[in-house]
Amino acid sequence: MTNPLFSFSRSPSSRSRLIVGISGGCDSTALLRLMVECWPNPSQKIVAAHVNYGLRGKQSQADEKAVRRLCARWKIRLKVLKVRDFKKRLHQNQKSLQDQARELRYSFFQRLVRQEGAWGMAVAHHLEDQAETVLDRFLRGSGAKGLSGLREIQTLTFSDSEPVLKVWRPLLRTTKKSLEDYLKSRNIDWREDESNEKLAYRRNQIRHEVLPFLSRWNPRLTEVLARMGEVTAAEDQFMDQFLEKTASNLKGRWTKSAYRCQGPAFQKMHPALQRRWIRRTAEKLTGEARGLSFDQVEEILRLWGGRKKGPRDVGYGLSAGIEGSWVYLKNSGLKKS
């Protein structure tokens, strides 16, 4: 990689095959073009992936056509997922639009990675995305975990049938303006998604209202938040590795819908590791537990410590309690938050 817009500390081997997500917008178009210019043998080693959710009618179709033209011009293979009846699925699954779209998108990416024998996925998250993620997590009340930003390389865990997806984010230190300037310098057009301006979405509120307001006190707030996220993401990764070694003493037992471990061994763990292990366990039982609040984690700690009688519903369809010397967390399948 020789382009200065790529500024990362970790990356897959340059011999690897990669799936590159492209929506047609500025960020992903810039990423794909950078990969074409910098990745060895891109026509053989890169496969572009586009999802057409069909939510914006003719605009969605125009996005797909624009992506097809770019990939044909740059001689990059393209795989497209056309989502049928997205709104019907949304109603049936009772999920938010963003969660449903994310689930469909990453499931598609995972299938492509497996089919193409690829290392994983490259996505176009940039410096502002990092800052917004850190601030969003902090505002949701996730505590110190909220300061942990996006990782350059991360392994996402899904269901048993599609367990993992490696994700590379090579643009985390690159600004949005730099990507726009890069495309303009090469006379490359991109698509604009009008929904990115709608303040009905939480992320857009943070981008267009909260960050600009807070930046009145620190004009470099976006950069500060992004760097904080980068540092804490590395520390978070170290803590996860340390946690795995410590948790081996718990003699934990997993089933598809439950986890249990020795209560006395759990109580010997440092409180910081206890909270982290509860979050890890809850998220493994249900992906929706990513939204588990500090108070809900504390509730599980009280139940597991015998300071509160159980079993009790602790949110997201999970219940916690004690059975003899064992403490447990179960997924009842009821999707409450």
At which residue positions do the language-model features occur?
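AMP-forming adenylation/ATP pyrophosphatase catalytic core
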Residues: 2-27, 43-51, 83, 104-105, ...
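Surface-exposed charge patches
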Residues: 69, 111, 180-181, 212, ...
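Catalytic subdomain that performs nucleotidyl-dependent activation
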Residues: 115, 120-124, 129-228, 232, ...
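Short, solvent-exposed polar/charged micro-motifs at secondary-structure junctions
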Residues: 88-93, 202-203, 234, 322-324
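ATP-dependent adenylation/nucleotidyltransferase module used to activate substrates
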Residues: 1-137, 158-160, 177, 266, ...
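A structural signal for well-ordered alpha-helical scaffolds and beta->alpha junctions
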Residues: 60, 64, 106, 175-176, ...
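Histidine kinase transmitter module recognition
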Residues: 38, 70, 213, 217, ...
